Amino acid sequence: MNIQVLEELRNSMEGIVQKSRKRTYTNAKRLRRLNERKLIPKVNDFMKYMRKQLQRGLTRVKARKPETFAEQLARWDAIIEEGKRILKPELLKILAEGGKAVVERKVIKQEAEPRFDMLGVPAVKWAEKHTAQLVTEVIEETKQAIREQVKAGIDYGKSIQKIAKELRPIVGLTSRQAGAVAKYRSLLEEQALPEQKISSLVERYANRLHRFRTQMIARTETASALSEGTLQGFEQIGIKRVQGVADEEACEYCLENIDGKIFTLDEAHGVIPAHPNCECVFVAAS
């Protein structure tokens, strides 16, 4: 076999591999969108529950000290437990979808019964740990936003009752989002609009940011669960190494640190998603 034939064969094999990876990426992206739509209502349920508890606390603020305002606003431990109750089952289902997508493709070729164990120790352990981390992170971001808005209100000379009233539409947002709402309120107040009109516009803007935050959390956590499920699926069928695949238009970080890079399974855990809008996936390394 001469060099030209070998080169043609090599190019042909590379083309087949590239097509296979592109197909895998497209299928993974479709699976991610499907499961993201399923997770959004659950994230929304948790966020609405947290907002309801916080807004209830805002009706009882007279005796609250500014420095402990956020901590005393609600029973945060109860919110954490409710968040875990709502989110853990759905994240476990999404993890299973990622695992099944790998295992079923492999086992079908062997003409055996495809099965991914979603109730196995690794899957359940990940879901428990990750859900607790997620809920805690969301709560800490929410607390920090409240602290910053309380401090800003006091620095501006507002009463604690006035601060509580302005907090109502923004509890549950991140610091940046809450700051954007506060800035929007200030701009409206400069226009000397009626208070009722200002409150209506602020609430509409805040609700848009609440929806955005819910969608962003759902997108990120769907990617996390599917990625973990994919890795656990690879482990079940004996794959030892994986390769990262990024879209051609992915961000610089993903192109430099994930796309084409080879990882052991241990190294790959937690790599994807690299950021909230990350759409990278793992394929079995050749």
Give, region by region, the residue ranges found by the protein language model.
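N-terminal leader/targeting and assembly helices and adjacent pre-domain segments
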Residues: 1-204, 286
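Acidic, glycine-rich two-metal-ion catalytic cores of nucleic acid-processing enzymes
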Residues: 196, 201-286
